[in-house]
């Protein structure tokens, strides 16, 4: 059960199973993490028999009520004939649109019930992943074309949309510095020159300077966490922000934006790459690279003849593994 909490910290579809009562409640932290990080997860919990539900029975807990604010959907199975359809639907919901956790609560007598399985034809479902409105994409492209100091900030939405290739091509096309959120660390190869570290509380001075001096911030699949904003009233003040995200609820939730595109990040990035020419911002990029060199994160040297320090091992491995970084 404790291990299942770690399963919420990966990007692919996950399944976790727990017994009733304390087993189910031990899943809550993992489910909440998956919900906040948009990780597809199907959590299956046991419960008391149907005739004991609602009677404060031994190890009975209203896990559906507890997890309602932190799941996309949850189910209490009341008929064994419904179980197969519920499981199929749960996996679909977990992966549809903005990904997230779904919970299935199964009473004990359902798990032991006998039923005749009827093979069913797969249901045709409507894909609710919005592609993005072409007019919004075109408007975003015009803003990017006219920017002199663009800055790209990418989050976990790029990774969950499997848009890393499109992200790399977009960064190359726009010729802009790139910062990644904690969940977006796999969105771009961070050995590229254009990568300048994270923003906000865990960020670099280079990223802060870039945000301060840019004239356009392009935000891809990120929800503007308070770890990044720090102060929403002063964050990117007087900057034009384009927010691209699959979840319309995130647009304007934590910060006002100048323009937005709601839809699948992979599709939108591909369309933007079609609309944009190969751009050059040599003076801007040279300035950012100077900051990156001046404010580079460095290990503080510690002299030790008797022991090998972990930071020295990591630095040496990095030097061996990483070749000279290049622009995308």
Briefly describe each language-model feature range:
Residues 81, 142, 147, 238-319, ...:
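Phosphate/pyrophosphate-binding active-site segments
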Residues 48-69, 190-195, 252, 256:
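Active-site-proximal loop->helix
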Residues 4-17, 73, 193-210:
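Glycine-rich oxoanion-binding loops at beta->alpha junctions
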Residues 108-135, 139, 284, 295, ...:
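Aromatic-enriched
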Residues 1-7, 11, 320-328:
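Single conserved hydrophobic/aromatic residue that forms the stacking wall/gate
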Residues 48-49, 106-112, 156-158, 184-185, ...:
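Glycine-rich beta-alpha junction loops
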Residues 158-242:
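Glycine-rich, anion-gripping cofactor-binding loops and their flanking helix/strand elements
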Residues 12-18, 26-29, 34-45, 68-120, ...:
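Structural signature of the thiamine diphosphate
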């Amino acid at each position: 059960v404790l291990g299942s909490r770690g399963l919420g910290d990966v990007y692919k579809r996950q399944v976790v199973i727990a017994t009733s009562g304390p087993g189910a409640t031990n899943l809550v932290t993992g489910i909440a993490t998956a919900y906040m990080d948009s990780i597809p997860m199907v959590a299956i919990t046991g419960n008391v028999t149907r005739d004991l539900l609602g009677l404060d029975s031994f190890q009975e807990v209203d896990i559906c009520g507890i997890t309602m604010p932190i799941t996309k959907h949850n189910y209490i199975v009341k008929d064994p004939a419904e179980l197969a359809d519920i499981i199929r639907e749960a996996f679909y919901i977990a992966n549809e649109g903005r990904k997230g956790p779904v919970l299935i609560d199964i009473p004990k007598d359902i798990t032991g019930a006998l039923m005749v399985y009827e093979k069913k034809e797969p249901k045709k479902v409507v894909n609710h992943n919005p592609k993005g409105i072409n007019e919004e994409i075109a408007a975003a492209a015009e803003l990017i074309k006219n920017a002199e100091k663009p800055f790209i900030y990418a989050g976990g939405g790029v990774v969950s949309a499997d848009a890393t290739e499109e992200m790399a091509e977009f960064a190359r096309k726009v010729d802009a510095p790139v910062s990644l959120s904690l969940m977006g660390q796999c969105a771009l190869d961070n050995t590229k020159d254009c990568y300048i570290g994270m923003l906000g509380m865990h960020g670099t001075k280079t990223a802060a300077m870039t945000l301060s001096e840019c004239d356009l911030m392009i935000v891809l699949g990120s929800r503007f966490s308070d770890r990044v904003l720090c102060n929403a009233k002063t964050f990117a003040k007087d900057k034009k922000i384009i927010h691209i995200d699959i979840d319309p609820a995130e647009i304007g939730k934590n910060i006002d934006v100048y323009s937005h595109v709601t839809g699948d990040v992979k599709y939108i990035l591909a369309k933007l790459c079609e609309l944009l020419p190969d751009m050059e911002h040599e003076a801007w990029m040279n300035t950012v690279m100077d900051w990156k060199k001046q404010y580079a994160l460095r290990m503080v040297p510690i002299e030790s003849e008797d022991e090998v320090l972990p930071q020295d091992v990591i630095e040496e491995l990095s030097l061996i593994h990483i070749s000279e970084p290049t622009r995308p």
